[in-house]
Amino acid sequence: MRIETNKAKWPLIYHGNGPAKENEIWKKTVKQWKNGADFKPNCTPEEEGITVITWSIPEETTMLQKSFEKMGMGKELIVIPITKPFNWLDKIKKTKEYLELIETKYILGLDATDVIVSSDIEGKPTIWYDVKGVFKNFNCKLVYNAEKMNWPSSDGHGTNIKEMDGLNGNLLRKLKETEEFEERIYKNLMDSDFYRFNSGGFMGYTDFTKEFYNTVWNKYVEPVYEKGFDEGFFGGDQGFLRIAQKEFFPDVTIDCNCKLFQTFAGINPDDIRGIYE
């Protein structure tokens, strides 16, 4: 199953982020995927030098796990366990820790509950080869998926931080700078509607991704880690990763043209040219 965008792109990974769950285009995509035939790629992610990770409660079977099972590759997905009560910042902490164990050249991180891996162009079995090829064409070291929604936003949506909140207020000031950066680079310069950072899908060179996550942890997350039980503190993990992108640009970028990742929150029929078996 594949989708084609209005820019004649064929993204490989689909993310029904946030409010996309009620989007009719996402619902149609999920239905097509569920009803579609199983397929077997010609190689594993590891054979292409890719480790694929996700984060979920061990007892649950998620959409991403089912996607891998349809490929006959359930064991190729590394599930980093997240336990209740949720500390949303564990996603950063545990990713940072697990990155130290990875020996492959590339790391692909995908949210568990709302991500589907496509069956590739015309059902050809080269999905992992193509994922790697698309990533390398970004000419960056780490790419995140991009979305239309601004979350968390400096006007208070998704965060309860106020600008006068001492050290925490610095996070909000950084967020305002990041919003302006995203608008300048991805909206105005790149002429994209998908100009906001989303943390639910990323791919990078493992060594550089280690550096990025260590910096985010040490500089932004560790001092406020205990506040992570409240997703509304700073948008879960997303706010922290998002504000770090500017200082790492252009090594860190977002997929504003949806070449690798397609997010679905806020999309409309004009964004998608077709959904195909």
Give the positions of each predicted feature.
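Short, high-confidence coil segments that cap the C-terminus of an alpha-helix
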Residues: K9-P11, T104, N139-K141
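N-terminal anchoring/stem segment of glycosyltransferases
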Residues: Y14-Y106, D207, F249
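Conserved donor-nucleotide/metal-binding helix-loop-beta segment in metal-dependent transferases, i.e.
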Residues: V115-E177, F181, N188
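A short acidic (Asp/Glu
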Residues: T62-Q65, V117-E122, I127-Y129, S154-G156, ...
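Conserved beta-strand elements of beta-rich interaction domains across eukaryotes
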Residues: G18-K21, I57, P85, D114-V115, ...
